Amino acid sequence: MSALIEGLPDAVAIRCLARVPYYLFPKLEVICRSWREAVHSTELYKAREELKSSENLLCVCAFDPENVWQLYDPTRDLWITLPVLPSKVRNLAHFGVVSTSRKLFVLGGGSDAVDPLTGDQDGSFATNEVWAYDPVVRQWAQRAPMIVPRAMFACCVVNGKILVAGGFTTCRKSISKAEIYDPDNDVWVSIPDLHYSHNSACTGLVIGGEVHVVHKGLTTVQVLTKDGWRVHEHSWLQGPMTVVNGSLYVMSHGLIYKQDRESRKVVISASGFKRRIGFAMMGFRDEIYVIGGVIGPEGWNSDIKKMSDVDVLTLGNEKPVWQKAASMTRCRGTILGCVELKI
């Protein structure tokens, strides 16, 4: 690699490039071959961490367009489109998504797609495939598959490892199986099953360092402690949930609540989202993001409106307020996955 910046040692030049925001990296790499090599080097990302210039971006995938992910840069209020996820499954949905080891992971899921000519189902309901997006090389790569194919399951990161539990397998049968993945060694290992499965989708939340598996429609929560799974009766509100700074927030009946173990308090009205379905509610930094979704037909209007809107609830202020962020530039409609990624 030739000198990055004339007159400067490469070690110093790398630290200069490390301060450039991620969205400009595609422009940096066309300057010259040595800059391209630097942009795709792990040394640059190590320097970003040392200089505290790493960026936390929001990753979003929607039903439309197919298998496309976008990154949101909150500092500059702009969206970046990633290369298309190269899965053979059309309209991949019902998957798990997390980030760890500075990579975006998309796990399992399947497709309800139907061939428009024959009417036959065009995909598998549940797969065991695992994809990782590496922002250093800006490419997707397949990783070791899960032991059990699954869709609509709980998926979390604990101590840098990915835990999956519950959901439905290929025959649409609910399962209680759980497993954990080591991204450094690309290995899956089975862990004790959940105490029960349920004929509904489940989601996973990390609260107080512990995984909580929540089934839609149930008041009980399964919590993974150092002694194994425990069943807790929490009577939490039903609705979209997210965690911000260790606290659980729920949108229910047109309101945002801060939910403690046995009590809750109203944070702010969310009546503007009553007609919207299929959106994501995501804790990001000190804020709650409500992203995308669709507005269904009403009255004589039979149209379905696919949304690309992004609404942000700022919690750090004495009085929480709703604000608008830049709309997604490619993705729109039902949100299939949403997670934070540190680059």
Regions found by a protein language model. Give the residues of each.
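Kelch-like beta-propeller repeat domains
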Residues: 1-343
